Amino acid sequence: MAEDNTPQCSFCGKEKSEVKQLIAADDANICNECIELCTDLIADSDEHGDDDSDIDTSWVNKKLPTPKELRAKLDEYVIGQDAAKKALAVAVYNHYKRLKVSQILANDSKKAKIGADDAMVELAKSNILLIGPTGSGKTLLAQTLARLLDVPFAMADATTLTEAGYVGEDVENIVQKLLQASDYDVSKAEQGIIYIDEIDKISKKGDNPSITRDVSGEGVQQALLKLIEGTVAAIPPHGGRKHPQQELIQVDTSNILIIVGGAFAGLDKVIQQRTEKTGIGFNADVSSKDDSRRSSELLQQVEPEDLIKFGLIPELIGRLPVLAALTELDEDALVQILTEPKNALVKQYKYLFDMEGADITFTKEALDAIAKKAMARKTGARGLRSIVENALLETMYELPSMKDAKTVLVDEQVINEGKTPEIA
């Protein structure tokens, strides 16, 4: 196996000693054999016109952000969750690098140019499971990654899914949402990201057999298997229903990155039972004042066997090789979320009030009070907007009708006691 510092082609993986020439650039290397392959592909395209137009090469020339660059961009929008950001950045980078290589190798007749078929390494898809409490940033991380990579994004709630043939959404509806997000461009949809939330809510009901079919639990997990590992989904055009004699849109999910997430309430207890048996866990129950910190520490130790015990089927866990646990946000992190990200809530309200010709200011005590309320409600970052919206409702109602209002001051009393903000 080559050492990490051995120069090698970024596309075929061959070392410098295995090729005639290796051309180095800032972000990648390419060997003479890959250059010849690309030259032949272009020549074939010129010679045969549109014969190869169905070969997608959208990622071949696109610059792929490195894991460090992805992480730095995530830092601009998401506060904390360093371990999860790192795991996501690496998984997403490897996924789209795999897609880039597969597009170069799309023309079967050219594979021999860069190595025999039996020497080629097939790169498996690294789908991701995010574990973390409500409002910790799971959805935001997935959305932000899709925006940074400029790929279509679709989100689904696992609790609304049922097996095909039952009332509710089936798994193909998720692919339909992605197709809609890509304006029915199949090629774009096949390179997108799907985020499935509340995956923990479809855990199996138990090991005991039941006379009633579990159509929204284990049944949905089974239905998700093919979507996650790769299948060709037949989607009716423009969101209609399937019917006979209808021409369906074929969407291959093999290159769609699947991210699933859930709060997994109670998983920390499952992990605690396992780790205590081996003498490395926590002896106290997770119920004291710092229970959220202990719970987060336990979730960092999650293993596939814990998820199986929780109720996910082994086949599903096997298709989600990247596990990332998010921690519950504390008050300091919530205050940072209010003020620091590019799209921070305080910045959004400042922009709204600027449009009315007024400058809004939140005191430090007001920000602390907002964070405390969100902590008390156990809604995490998701509950911040609701608290601010309620506090500013009356002001936002009156302000557009006021001609001489220049400043709005939000202090602790506005948040805690419902006092109207001071307008001057």
From Swiss-Prot:
One of its GO biological process terms is: proteolysis involved in protein catabolic process
Kindly list the positions annotated as binding Zn(2+): 9, 12, 31, 34
Q: Which residues bind ATP?
A: 133-140
Assembly state and interactors? Component of the ClpX-ClpP complex. Forms a hexameric ring that, in the presence of ATP, binds to fourteen ClpP subunits assembled into a disk-like structure with a central cavity, resembling the structure of eukaryotic proteasomes.
Q: Which organism is it from?
A: Psychrobacter cryohalolentis (strain ATCC BAA-1226 / DSM 17306 / VKM B-2378 / K5)
* Domain of life of the native organism: Bacteria
Pfam families referenced in this protein's UniProt entry, alphabetically:
AAA_2, ClpB_D2-small, zf-C4_ClpX
Q: What does this protein do?
A: ATP-dependent specificity component of the Clp protease. It directs the protease to specific substrates. Can perform chaperone functions in the absence of ClpP.
Keyword terms of this UniProt record? ATP-binding, Chaperone, Metal-binding, Nucleotide-binding, Zinc
Locate the ClpX-type ZB domain: which residues?
1-50
Family membership noted in the UniProt record: Belongs to the ClpX chaperone family.
Database matches in NCBIfam families: clpX, PRK05342.1
Which named protein is this? ATP-dependent Clp protease ATP-binding subunit ClpX
